[in-house]
Amino acid sequence: MTEYKLVVVGAGGVGKSALTIQLIQNHFVDEYDPTIEDSYRKQVVIDGETCLLDILDTAGQEEYSAMRDQYMRTGEGFLCVFAINNTKSFEDIHHYREQIKRVKDSEDVPMVLVGNKCDLPSRTVDTKQAQDLARSYGIPFIETSAKTRQGVDDAFYTLVREIRKHKEKMSKDGKKKKKKTKTKCIIM
């Protein structure tokens, strides 16, 4: 069974834990209890393939930022979460993305942009803004509500699909490189 290491990143209070717990336990946690770091595992079937999701729910608070490099190193894919009623959390996404790319030493890291709390009427981040940002990054965008469960499965499953595409691309690139190294030389 394939295991996928997913990491949920974003500013404090955007609902990273609420999304993760909604996926894992099917219930909404409405009290805010800042996370230091929590790990969850769940077996799911995505596109007919049974797989194990190993999800790391991370601290959004700045005082835990030193831990970020470590979990970013081990993650295969990242849910970059902001709250649709918090413009600052949306602006912070750029910093998380840059840090992920730096730590992974790659421009091409599987990510999904997630606009959480879409059940709230007090939107400050327009859907089009988020779609434009995701398009500029070349990643999918999904609006979610941990409260109503809207888009929760879709966000995590889309990330798994992005990881699969990435792995497939990497193995094709690897085969191309191997073929290139098998050139024969003649010494005269």
UniProtKB/Swiss-Prot annotation:
Membrane-topology descriptor: Lipid-anchor
Molecular function, one GO term: GTP binding
EC number: 3.6.5.2
Record bears the keyword Transport: no
Residues bearing PTM Cysteine methyl ester: C185
A GO cellular component entry from the record: cytoplasmic side of plasma membrane
UniProt subcellular location: Cell membrane; Cytoplasm
Covalently lipidated residues, kind S-farnesyl cysteine: C185
Sequence intervals crossing the membrane: none
GO biological process: signal transduction
Propiece span(s): 186-188
Effector region, short sequence motif: residues: 32-40
Entry annotated with the keyword Lipoprotein: yes
Gene3D superfamilies: P-loop containing nucleotide triphosphate hydrolases
Region span, Disordered: 168-188
Record's keyword terms, sorted: Cell membrane, Cytoplasm, GTP-binding, Hydrolase, Lipoprotein, Membrane, Methylation, Nucleotide-binding, Prenylation
Activity regulation (record text): Alternates between an inactive form bound to GDP and an active form bound to GTP. Activated by a guanine nucleotide-exchange factor (GEF) and inactivated by a GTPase-activating protein (GAP).
Main location: membrane
Domain of life assignment: Eukaryota
Top class in the EC scheme: hydrolase
InterPro entries (alphabetical): P-loop_NTPase, Small_GTP-bd, Small_GTPase, Small_GTPase_Ras-type
Residues bound to GTP: 10-18, 29-35, 59-60, 116-119
Reported function: Ras proteins bind GDP/GTP and possess intrinsic GTPase activity. Plays an important role in the regulation of cell proliferation. May play a role in promoting oncogenic events by inducing transcriptional silencing of tumor suppressor genes (TSGs).
Similarity-based family: Belongs to the small GTPase superfamily. Ras family.
PANTHER family for this protein: RAS, DI-RAS, AND RHEB FAMILY MEMBERS OF SMALL GTPASE SUPERFAMILY (PTHR24070)
This protein's name: GTPase KRas
Annotated gene: KRAS
